[in-house]
């Protein structure tokens, strides 16, 4: 019996699930992303999908990661401290495993590399690009925006999304300002070795980048 393709939500990229595989249209920077995923697999990084090659029509073929991707409004499980803690630890793990790769491939990413080249940043580390088993992060997906850069760039955006640092009335926000601040501190605690003043400054710069 043939496997029935299933369209998945993939932002601006066409994404189709076929059995245990995901087919994604290639775009600017895909060659670098495929290299990165291959290196991550070789190094035993457990949070990223395996790159399985290209389909006959030139699409990326990736391993399907079992679990639930975060979508808004976030369910209670993904608003939990466990979700924040597991996300911070996974991001730290990604940065640690790529710390010697940041200067290896600087050109050819979808987003320009940003100095200092400390790690390979995911570039869009948010609940919608993570896979969860209940409240625990078990996978990171959509590496299209990955690029070399300073780790605080990734940390700041992750905190913006996971705290989340939004106005109480924002459609994707939740919790009081005090609760958001507590969750931001929790993320920093679990990630470790991050300048919290610089985090807030970098959040502001990242948001300005998004609207510019």
Model-predicted regions and their roles:
Residues 2-38, 53-56, 61-63, 69-77:
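ATP-binding glycine-rich loop module of kinase domains
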Residues 9-10, 22, 54-55, 86, ...:
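A generic "structured core" feature
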Residues 13-17, 51, 109-154:
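Active-site acidic catalytic loop and adjacent metal/ATP-binding pocket
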Residues 41-54:
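Conserved HxN/HPN-centered segment at the entrance to the catalytic loop
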Residues 57-80, 93-101, 164, 208-212:
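A glycine-centered beta->alpha junction motif in the catalytic cores
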Residues 73-107, 118-123, 127-133, 184-193:
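Conserved kinase catalytic-core helix
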Residues 155-191, 207-212:
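Active-site activation/catalytic loop segments of kinase-like enzymes and analogous catalytic loops
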